[in-house]
Amino acid sequence: NEKAKDYIRVLDEKSQRLKQLTEDLVEASKISSGNIKLEFMNLNLNELVQQVNGEFAERFEGRNLDLICILQPEPLLIRADSRRIWRVLENLYVNVCKYAMPGTRVYVDAIKKDGKIQLSIKNISENPLNFQADELTERFIRGDVSRSTEGSGLGLSIAKNLTVLQHGSFNIYLDGDLFKVTITFDEAV
């Protein structure tokens, strides 16, 4: 019967959400306690970004987001843990999917400058950004209007803490409805 199928679908969605929240809480707890093992290696940030772009292409299309990605032709090598840097990028892209205004562009660019590798992601927010940038990386903090979307309020906090654990810097800039996040690492030698 249709009603039973709807209940099962809702239960499945809620259990998936609970599973994700639990994983986020465990990850946040490990990070804050320092109980996380990092395996550093040289990674090409260009390749990672291209992989994440591929993973999120369908989701971006579903939100009618036009991805403009500008990467340098030469490899942009950083020293990081591949699983953890993937999680950083995944959290940033999930954030774009949830909060970017549909029908707008998302800009992703990576550059090498003065021995540093910098990745920036910019988008126009669907909701007003009437709070301080540093509030967004506090645990469980979400803009009031965003409460209608799924999320734990941990995504940007986890992304920032994982970036810092890997000796990178993580900065958020807000300007009107423009949201920009920049992560920076030393260039690997």
For each feature predicted by the language model, list its residue ranges.
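Short conserved segment of the HATPase_c
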Residues: 128-141
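Short beta-strand/loop element within the Bergerat-fold HATPase_c
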Residues: 103-115
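Conserved micro-motifs of the catalytic ATP-binding
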Residues: 33-38, 77-80
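Conserved catalytic submotifs in the C-terminal HATPase_c
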Residues: 39-43, 61, 66-76
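Short helix-loop "hinge" at the ATP-lid/N-box region of the Bergerat-fold HATPase_c
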Residues: 96-97
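Conserved glycine-rich
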Residues: 167-168
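Short alpha-helical segment of the dimerization/phosphotransfer core of two-component systems
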Residues: 13-18
